[in-house]
């Protein structure tokens, strides 16, 4: 017989009494009746009918008391999650984006004005937009280029952002219609009486050059631009008129002084002054004028250089050495001026004459504080008080073999070793209040830091001096630029520079055939030419390819030299076989004109006398 187990339905189903009494609810977990008051019942019914969620904490606590500990924890967590979800979430802004996303967004902008405006927004935008702003540079003024070279020497980290520089568009300071205006003024000078004032107004339109930046702080040169003088006539009529005007001016002054003694006018003046003080005039601040700095005018003592657009050789050498990641260098149609390099042993004597003093001393510290992510305080970075961090980092990087530098490094590692030492006081963190009480640093420290500033070289164009002792100077030639390009961008890994892709040396009058051969020989590795072979019958424009591997480099030598249409002054594209053959012929001095090349082909085609007959 199959025995059936008895099932207790009361343990699973609610009692019948709970269905009849609306003031009670049955809990299926504890199998007990939960009494509910009328006030709580009305709240539950209103919630079930679609009303607002107005349940109180008392109803929830009645049900929670009947549950186990685990259920209590889960219910508490659910309440916390619900409260946080209902809270207002902060909106996600641009600053919360990762740096990679911001760099991609700024890369799509491609606008110089937009990058300049972004640098004024916040510190994060400044750090992201600065590399894009300095990536592609082109100059039209020698004054602005001189300022930029000095800024590179003050802050060499900017040179890592530069990839393209264009100096082919540099112009002189005179306006385009300056010559026509001078001719018209010369013609009308004899007939009109305002000739001198017109000429001075036209002179004031001439823009400043790099020499104005060089002699900016030189006391021998006036800082003021050309003065607007007035013409003086020696006629008797004008003198009588001037005497009458002076007498009338004296009478007006006396009348004004007497008017102050009248009480009525005094009250009016006082009331008008009080009104002006109570209600000052409204002024609007235009942030757009912050960077609209007009170009300075030429100095009156440098008018002889108004039509020149030359640049010193030292500036170009600074540009090449301080920009290691440059890809495109355009020096086409650029005129160079002579320059001199100051000897290393006498460089420290001219520290006070350097053009880096044209900028404020806190410029480098401010820029480093903005670009540094791990700076301790904004006060130190903005005002340049972090002397331990900014001023002496070059000593540890450059590994100077000097006893004084070793003492500096030892004192930096143990700043509290000797309290009486000058170095321990100098390397301690200064206080703004007692900054003037600190002892001055010894001159050897300033000399070492100055000699290692930038690329470690100082030229005569970097000083606000016109001349000095010839024993301290070594003259620079134009070939130093070619040697600097080949030295900075050639590497042992490959035959060419890893980054340099375009060099424009077109319309260079000083460039000769021998200098071009040396420059191309330094850039191109000779190992490439040993296994290659060019026959005499093969021309530059022939279709047969050689074993030379093409490189991504273009060198423009067109219209260079003292004559036009020279055989070696051509565009050399090493991506093509024609350019690779041409560069080999230039190095081997085997470039011929069209007539000589035709005669060579004819001689090879006909052969020697009797050779074809015997064959």
UniProtKB/Swiss-Prot annotation:
Keywords for the protein's UniProt record, in alphabetical order: Ubl conjugation pathway
Renumbered residue ranges of the record's region Disordered: 172-198, 264-291
Residue spans crossing the bilayer: none
Keyword presence, Aminoacyl-tRNA synthetase: no
Domain F-box: 91-137
Compositionally biased residues, Basic residues: 264-278
Function of the protein: F-box protein probably involved in ubiquitin conjugation pathway.
Name used for this protein in its record: F-box protein COS111
């Amino acid at each position: 017989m199959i025995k059936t187990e008895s099932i207790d339905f009361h343990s699973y189903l609610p009692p019948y009494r709970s269905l009849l009494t609306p003031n009670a609810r049955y809990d299926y977990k504890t199998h007990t009746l939960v009494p509910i008051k009328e006030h709580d019942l009305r709240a539950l019914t209103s919630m079930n009918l679609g009303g607002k969620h107005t349940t109180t904490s008392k109803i929830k606590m009645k049900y929670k008391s009947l549950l186990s500990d685990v259920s209590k924890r889960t219910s508490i967590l659910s309440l916390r999650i619900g409260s946080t979800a209902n809270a207002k979430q902060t909106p996600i802004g641009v600053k919360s984006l990762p740096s990679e996303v911001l760099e991609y967004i700024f890369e799509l902008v491609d606008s110089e004005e937009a990058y300049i405006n972004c640098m004024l927004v916040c510190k994060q935008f400044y750090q992201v937009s600065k590399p894009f702003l300095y990536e592609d540079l082109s100059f039209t003024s020698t004054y602005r280029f001189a300022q930029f070279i000095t800024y590179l020497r003050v802050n060499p980290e900017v040179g890592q952002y530069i990839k393209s520089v264009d100096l082919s568009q540099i112009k002189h300071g005179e306006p385009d219609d300056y010559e026509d205006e001078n001719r018209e003024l010369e013609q009308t000078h004899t007939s009109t009486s305002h000739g001198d004032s017109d000429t001075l107004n036209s002179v004031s339109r001439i823009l400043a050059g790099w020499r104005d930046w060089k002699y900016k702080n030189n006391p021998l040169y006036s800082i003021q631009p050309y003065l607007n003088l007035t013409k003086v006539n020696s006629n008797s009529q004008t003198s009588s008129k001037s005497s009458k005007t002076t007498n009338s001016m004296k009478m007006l002054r006396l009348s004004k002084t007497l008017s102050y003694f009248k009480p009525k006018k005094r009250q009016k003046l006082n009331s008008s002054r009080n009104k002006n003080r109570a209600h000052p005039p409204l002024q609007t601040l235009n942030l757009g004028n912050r960077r609209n700095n007009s170009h300075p005018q030429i100095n009156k003592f440098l008018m002889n250089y108004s039509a020149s657009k030359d640049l010193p050789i030292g500036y170009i050498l600074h540009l090449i050495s301080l920009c290691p990641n440059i890809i495109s260098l355009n020096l086409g149609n650029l005129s160079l001026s002579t320059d001199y390099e100051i000897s290393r042993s006498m460089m420290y004597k001219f520290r006070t004459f350097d053009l880096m003093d044209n900028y404020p001393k806190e410029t480098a510290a401010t820029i480093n504080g903005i670009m540094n992510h791990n700076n301790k305080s904004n006060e130190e970075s903005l005002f340049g008080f972090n002397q331990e961090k900014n001023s002496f980092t070059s000593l540890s990087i450059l590994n100077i073999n000097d006893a004084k530098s070793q003492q500096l490094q030892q004192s930096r590692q143990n700043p509290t070793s000797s309290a009486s030492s000058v170095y321990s006081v100098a390397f301690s963190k200064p206080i703004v209040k007692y900054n003037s009480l600190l002892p001055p640093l010894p001159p050897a420290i300033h000399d070492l830091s100055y000699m290692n500033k930038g690329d470690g070289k100082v030229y005569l164009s970097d000083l606000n001096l016109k001349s000095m002792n010839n024993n301290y100077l070594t003259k620079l030639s134009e070939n130093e630029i070619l040697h600097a390009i080949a030295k900075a961008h050639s590497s042992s890994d490959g035959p060419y520079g890893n980054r340099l892709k375009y060099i424009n040396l077109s319309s260079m009058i000083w460039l000769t055939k021998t200098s071009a051969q040396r420059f191309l020989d330094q850039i191109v590795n000779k190992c490439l030419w040993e296994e290659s072979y060019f026959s005499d019958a093969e021309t530059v424009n022939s279709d047969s390819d050689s074993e030379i591997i093409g490189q991504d480099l273009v060198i423009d030598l067109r219209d260079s030299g003292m004559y036009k249409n020279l055989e070696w002054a051509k565009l050399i594209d090493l991506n093509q076989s024609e350019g690779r053959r041409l560069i080999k012929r230039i190095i081997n001095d085997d470039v011929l004109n069209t007539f000589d090349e035709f005669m060579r082909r004819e001689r090879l085609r006909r052969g020697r006398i009797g050779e074809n007959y015997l064959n």
